Swiss-Prot record:
Enzyme class (EC, first level): isomerase
Binding site for Mn(2+) 2: D306, H311, H359
Cofactor(s) essential for the protein: Mn(2+)
Catalytic activity: 2-deoxy-alpha-D-ribose 1-phosphate = 2-deoxy-D-ribose 5-phosphate; alpha-D-ribose 1-phosphate = D-ribose 5-phosphate
Biological process terms in GO annotation: 2-deoxyribose 1-phosphate catabolic process; 5-phosphoribose 1-diphosphate biosynthetic process; metabolic compound salvage; nucleotide metabolic process
Record note on cofactor: Binds 2 manganese ions.
Name used for this protein in its record: Phosphopentomutase
UniProt feature coiled coil, ranges: none
Keywords, comma-separated and alphabetical: Cytoplasm, Isomerase, Manganese, Metal-binding
Subcellular location: Cytoplasm
GO molecular function list: magnesium ion binding; manganese ion binding; phosphopentomutase activity
The organism of origin for this protein: Helicobacter pylori (strain J99 / ATCC 700824)
Enzyme nomenclature, EC number: 5.4.2.7
Pathway terms, separated by semicolons: Carbohydrate degradation; 2-deoxy-D-ribose 1-phosphate degradation; D-glyceraldehyde 3-phosphate and acetaldehyde from 2-deoxy-alpha-D-ribose 1-phosphate: step 1/2
Length: 413
C-alpha cells in the first residue's frame, strides 16, 4: 500500500505554557489563547481582519480541543463541540531549549538533551577572540552590532551605517544563534554566505546551533527589508533521523519546503523547495500535495508566524496569517490522497502578546487526519518525538529511540 505523510508545521504556534515554563520565564504565555482573547475583545482588528479568530478547518482537526486540554481553557470564540474530523493530542518538549532546531530535531527522533551554547550578554555579546578570528579568516575590516536585537529593528538602526562602511551586522537573541545581516546587493549574497560558512566553522566547537545569513535590500531605514534569501547553517543532528530510516528502509522521498532542509542541516532530505512568503509556502505545499509521488514525506515549515508576527509581537498580524492559512488548509485537505496522513504541529511558542521578543516555552498542538483515523483525543505527549514515532508506525519503519505511537486506525483492536 503506497502511503504519504504531509507535515504542516506552524512555526511558534504554541497552545499554552508548559509545566516547565517557569524555568524559562514564560509563565502565562499562550500563543493561541492570547491571540484568540485579543480577537474576541476586538483588540486585533485591522484593515485586514476583525472580530473573533475564525479557524474552522483547524478547529475541525481538533485545534481548540487540543488547546483546551493543554491550557484548561477553550480559546475564546472556539466551539466546545466542533465538527471534528481529526484526532488530536498536545505535546510537551523534552529538549532543554525552546528554539526551532530543538523542536524540529526532537519530533524526528533526536531530542536535544545537552545544552546549546548561548551568547547571554545583551551588549558586547560575542567574545573578542571569536570576533578577531572571524575578521582574520574572512578579511572583513570591521563589524556592527555585537548585541541582542530584533532582526528587523537592527537593520533599521544600523543599515545606513552598514551601507557607508560595508561592515556586516552581527547580532544574536535568547536562542543559540549567531546572525549576520548584510545588504544583498551592496555587500553581495555570495559574500554574505561565505562569511556565514566561515563563522559557522569557528562557532561549531561552542555548540552554537545556527549561523543565519539575513540579507536585506533598500536604501535607507524607511525602506530596508529582509529578502527571502535567508540561509541557515546548522549543526548536524546528533542522532539518526526518521528521514534517514525512511530512505534506507522504504527508499522514500523526503521533500523539504521552506527552511526544513536548513534546520536539519540537509540530513535525510531528497528534494528541496524554497518559498518567500506565507502565500508561496502554501502554494508550493499544495503543489506537492497534488503532485509528489507516493512513498513521500512532505514537510513544510511556515516560518512567518514566528519571524513576522511572534517575534515582532504583532497580535493582529498573527491572527490574520492564521486565518489565511486556515483557508488554504481546506485546499490541502481537499487534495489529500486515499492513504495520506496529515499532521499539523508546531515547534515552540512565540506569544505575540508576551513580554520581550523571544520564544515562549509552550505545549504544541499535534493534530492528525487520515480517512481511517477515528476522531478522538489521543492524550498528552511527553515528547515531540511521539510525532516521529507515529509516522514510523504508519510507514512501517523501525521504531525511533524516543516517543510512542499515538495512532489507532479504524478496524484495529
Amino acid at each position: 500500500m503506497q502511503k504519504r505523510v504531509v507535515i504542516l508545521l506552524l512555526d511558534s504556534f504554541g497552545i499554552g505554557a508548559s509545566e516547565d515554563a517557569k524555568d524559562f520565564g514564560d509563565l502565562g504565555a499562550n500563543t493561541l489563547g492570547n491571540i484568540a482573547k485579543a480577537c474576541f475583545n476586538n483588540l486585533a482588528d485591522s484593515n485586514d481582519r476583525n472580530g473573533v479568530l475564525k479557524l474552522p478547518n483547524l478547529e475541525g482537526l481538533g485545534l481548540g480541543l487540543s488547546a483546551l486540554k493543554a491550557a484548561n481553557e477553550l480559546p475564546l470564540g472556539f466551539q466546545l463541540k466542533p465538527n471534528l474530523i481529526g484526532a488530536y493530542a498536545y505535546a510537551k518538549e523534552l529538549s532543554s531549549a525552546k528554539d526551532t532546531i530543538s523542536g524540529h530535531w526532537e519530533m524526528m527522533g533526536a531530542p536535544v538533551l545537552f545544552e546549546w551554547g548561548y551568547f547571554k550578554d545583551k551588549n558586547d555579546s560575542f567574545p573578542k577572540e571569536i570576533l578577531d578570528e572571524i575578521m582574520h579568516k574572512t578579511k572583513i575590516k570591521g563589524y556592527l552590532g555585537n548585541c541582542h536585537a530584533s532582526g528587523t529593528e537592527i537593520i533599521k538602526d544600523l543599515g545606513e551605517k552598514h551601507l557607508e562602511t560595508l561592515y556586516p551586522i552581527f547580532y544574536t537573541s535568547a536562542d543559540s544563534v549567531f546572525q549576520i545581516a548584510a545588504h544583498e546587493e551592496r555587500f553581495g549574497l555570495d559574500h554574505l554566505y561565505a562569511l556565514c560558512e566561515e563563522a559557522f566553522q569557528i562557532l561549531e566547537p561552542l555548540k552554537i546551533a545556527r549561523v543565519i545569513a539575513r540579507p536585506f535590500i533598500g536604501t535607507n531605514r524607511e525602506n530596508f527589508k529582509r529578502t527571502a534569501n535567508r540561509k541557515d547553517y546548522a549543526i548536524k543532528p546528533h542522532k539518526k533521523l526518521l528521514f534517514e530510516t525512511f530512505i534506507e528502509e522504504k527508499q522514500g522521498e523526503v521533500i523539504s519546503i521552506g527552511k526544513i532542509a536548513d534546520i536539519y542541516a540537509h540530513v535525510g532530505i531528497t528534494q528541496k523547495f524554497k518559498a518567500g512568503s506565507l502565500m508561496e509556502l502554501c502554494d508550493v505545499t499544495l503543489d506537492q500535495v497534488k503532485n509528489a509521488p507516493n512513498n513521500s514525506l512532505i514537510f513544510t515549515n511556515f516560518v512567518h508566524f514566528d519571524s513576522d508576527y511572534g517575534h515582532r509581537r504583532d497580535v493582529s498580524g498573527y491572527a490574520n496569517a492564521l486565518e489565511y492559512f486556515d483557508a488554504r488548509l481546506k485546499e490541502v485537505l481537499d487534495n489529500l490522497r486515499e492513504n495520506d496522513l496529515l499532521i499539523l504541529c508546531a515547534d515552540h511558542g512565540c506569544d505575540p502578546s508576551f513580554k520581550g521578543t523571544d520564544h515562549t516555552r509552550e505545549y504544541i498542538p499535534v493534530l492528525f487526519y487520515h480517512k481511517d483515523l477515528q476522531p478522538a483525543f489521543l492524550g498528552k505527549s511527553e515528547t515531540f518525538a511521539d510525532i516521529g514515532q507515529s509516522i514510523a508506525y504508519f510507514l512501517g519503519l523501525s521504531p525511533l529511540d524516543y516517543g510512542k505511537n499515538l495512532l489507532n486506525f479504524k478496524g484495529q483492536p
